From Swiss-Prot:
Motif range (PIP-box K+4 motif): 135-159
Zn finger limits (C4-type): 12-40
Subunit-level organization: Interacts with HDAC1; the interaction is prevented by competitive binding of C10orf90/FATS to HDAC1 facilitating acetylation and protein stabilization of CDKN1A/p21. Interacts with MKRN1. Interacts with PSMA3. Interacts with PCNA. Component of the ternary complex, cyclin D-CDK4-CDKN1A. Interacts (via its N-terminal domain) with CDK4; the interaction promotes the assembly of the cyclin D-CDK4 complex, its nuclear translocation and promotes the cyclin D-dependent enzyme activity of CDK4.
Signal peptide range: none
Gene coding for it: Cdkn1a
The keyword Cytoplasm is annotated on this UniProt entry: yes
Induction or repression: By p53, mezerein (antileukemic compound) and interferon beta.
Modifications after synthesis and translation: Phosphorylation of Thr-140 or Ser-141 impairs binding to PCNA. Phosphorylation at Ser-112 by GSK3-beta enhances ubiquitination by the DCX(DTL) complex. Phosphorylation of Thr-140 by PIM2 enhances its stability and inhibits cell proliferation. Phosphorylation of Thr-140 by PIM1 results in the relocation of CDKN1A to the cytoplasm and enhanced CDKN1A protein stability. UV radiation-induced phosphorylation at Ser-78 and Ser-141 by NUAK1 leads to its degradation.
Disulfide bond positions: none
Protein name, per record: Cyclin-dependent kinase inhibitor 1
Region (Required for binding CDKs): 53-58
Residue(s) of cross-link: Glycyl serine ester (Ser-Gly) (interchain with G-Cter in ubiquitin): 2
Region Interaction with TRIM39, annotated ranges: 147-159
Highest classification ranks of the organism: Eukaryota, Metazoa, Chordata, Craniata, Vertebrata
Amino acid sequence: MSNPGDVRPVPHRSKVCRCLFGPVDSEQLRRDCDALMAGCLQEARERWNFDFVTETPLEGNFVWERVRSLGLPKVYLSPGSRSRDDLGGDKRPSTSSALLQGPAPEDHVALSLSCTLVSERPEDSPGGPGTSQGRKRRQTSLTDFYHSKRRLVFCKRKP
């Protein structure tokens, strides 16, 4: 054990973070990352018969076909892919005017009505019937998700 009188003050250093391996060569790091990305893209290209750089299908074991995104919610559509589909990009069939108009307004109204009906039902609320939405949720326990079961242990009776 050390004595309290043996305590030496630690010299104050301005930097806590130390460069242990020398300065970073950003050009070499970029080349390494580009080489790794090119290797991953080549492996994916051979595996899936699809060129992910140009986004074109290749000949091979898989047959790729275009799926229109009319049935998908807008959350799943990236802004770039939606504009390319609408504009009819390279090697893609042009879209008709009916497809560019989007969903019919009556479909949108029916969807919003069904959503409001679901949210107004109190028995579907997380706190159960009769609880207000403003309250905090209680802490969940393991038995909320799994039913507790008694384990049967068979043993011989003592005579």
